[in-house]
Amino acid sequence: MTPFASPAGRPALLRAAVAAALCCTAGTVYAQAQQPAASTPSQREQELQNRVEKLERRIGDLESSAVLSEPETTVKRIEVYVDENGVQYTEPGPGRTPQVTYQRERTFRRQTISEKLDEAMEDAASRSVGVGVDAAIVLQNVQQDTGPDAPADGNNYQLASADIFFTAGLAQNTIFYADIVGLSGTPPDNEVGGLTLLNGYTARLVNQNELNLRESWIQTQLAKERVGLTIGRVDLTNYFDHNAVANDETTQFLSDALVNNPMLGLSENGAGLAAVYDPKNGFSAKFGYQQSSSTAQNLSDSLFYLGEVSKLFTPFNLGEGTYRVWFRTDNSSGEDQTAYGISLDQKLTASLTLFARYGEAEAGPDEDDEFYSIGFQLKNGVVINPEDAWGVGFANTELGAGDAEDLLEGYYNLRLTQKMQLSFHLTHVTEKPLGVEEVSYFVPGVRFQASF
């Protein structure tokens, strides 16, 4: 700390301090030069000259990179000694009683220019609204493989998607988030008519060719950031049934069956809450509820309750693996129905990760729907660029009513820049409707994604 001074006097104080240091150092060097030594006088003079030049460089660096801050008021805890007349002393003495008091001081603090700029930017960021964009264009083609002629055979499809999201800090450990999404184009799902979506960008969105509010919520962290609460319009698939390598349609698999477990049953985003307990030891527990119908008349209609526990393991000296188990209930059919599922991802090496999902849901008095998926992702190995990744996944869906679907997808995600990615996909899907001849398709596709 340096004593308080007016802003106009700061440069003078700085120069005076530097001049005093220079004189002191020069005097020391001169005194040393007067003492007998083995070196010649010319060597001493050269040494003195070098040290003076070094000090001048330091003065220049100090003046160009350091500033004195605006005066700051600080509160300092001090101990004083008070006699019977109330007079305060700084030293103990007869008849003096020690007391603790607080004293305010106005001081300057020397800062580098970069520190000052960082503080200003952090302060501005905490008071402003952050805006981000995640945009994608997906091109797909459908080629029928087997079965009777279908309307999708030979057709091309294009879907453009743009997410504009806003974030703002409201208080300590409390943020606001909103995501507005717009879709335009035609995915192949309208003509293929499969059990799951071949383009996961349209999942849980009702209308296309218009803007939709995907999410809007407030999140806060409590109990030393071990408990997180999110309330508003939410998408519970962001909190439940996670998977490290099969959970993101923007960078991983494009088919929705390899992004989310269809046994979760969530068809639309809606009002809800998510609570997460994470003690930072590899274990976490989650609970949430969400309405999944835009035509519901009250919060009790089409209401889903979900709970999940997860644990991080390193079995058999392998890499890290996360194992999750979830359970849900919903009344969207007019009666309470239940479902459960698991999701796991396990690293075998630093580059290779396996994944698997399973789920089962009540579909009627004596009928259950079932689903499973398996696959892998290879990253930073057998790739073109160091940050590229590719994967292969298989998913099987069987409804209690008798319909079934098999889906196989492979993709290669090419990292173009830090903000742009280009991926290539090839999907083979077989639809097996009850009582109707099965039909299968090859669906090649290209996805361009940019985020900024």
Question: Positions of the model-derived regions?
Answer:
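N-terminal periplasmic/intermembrane-space "pro-region" immediately following the signal or transit peptide
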Residues: T2-F4, A20-C23, V29-P151, G169
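Transmembrane beta-barrel strands of outer-membrane/channel proteins
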Residues: V133-N141, A178-G182, L229-R233, F287-Q291, ...
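Surface-exposed loop and membrane-interface regions of Gram-negative outer-membrane beta-barrel proteins
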Residues: L139-S161, G169-S216, L222, A296-D301, ...
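Residues that define the transmembrane beta-barrel architecture of outer-membrane proteins
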Residues: G154-A160, N209-R214, S267-A271, D301-Y305, ...
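Repeated loop/turn-to-beta-strand initiation elements of outer-membrane beta-barrel proteins
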Residues: Q172-F176, E225-L229, N281-F287, P315-Y323, ...
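Surface-exposed coil loops of outer-membrane beta-barrel proteins
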Residues: D189-W217, K224-F304
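Detector for outer-membrane/organellar transmembrane beta-barrel domains
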Residues: G307-L399, G410
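Outer-membrane beta-barrel "beta-signal"
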Residues: F376, S440-F452
